[in-house]
Amino acid sequence: MSEKTPRLVRSELIDLPVVEASGVAVRQTERGAVVLVIGDRTAEVGACLIGARGELDDWTLIDLATLPGWPLPSGDSQFEAIAADGGSLVAVMREDPPVVLVADTEPRHLRAEIRLTAPAGSVLDGQWGDASSRGEGLVFLRGGRLLVAQEKRPRALIEFGPVGAEPKGLSSDDLLGPEES
């Protein structure tokens, strides 16, 4: 390669309302794109609408720890990633223990607590036990599945699905569309 690799440079710095930001997701809406951020100190999700011309609304905070049935103490989240569907669901993921919490932001309630496990005999058997080498990125997939980026040992994209379901693999048809849950 004789050409230099293109670089990205900071073109704008946007102050975030969460402590120790660790995950970002985008939800497409009729009004524009909504950027969602989560930090690894609290369960507060910051949300900001980006208008069609790039104008930013004020950040709003949704404190997931105030939802009925929220299983974690306030101020102890250790979230590594956030995902959003095309409706009102957000999912936040912890690395240790490996769990995804799914919340509906309208109306505000906890929808699911999903334990990410590696069944005996699976490709991940024996490789998912390292608490410092689990999920770092998260995407909703169709069919109740999740795509997780594993940090190391091995570096991989992992498909998690409902118990008993066979892995489907990944294609562009698996990604949720705008307004799709």
List PLM regions with ranges.
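Sequence/structural signature of beta-propeller domains
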Residues: 1-181
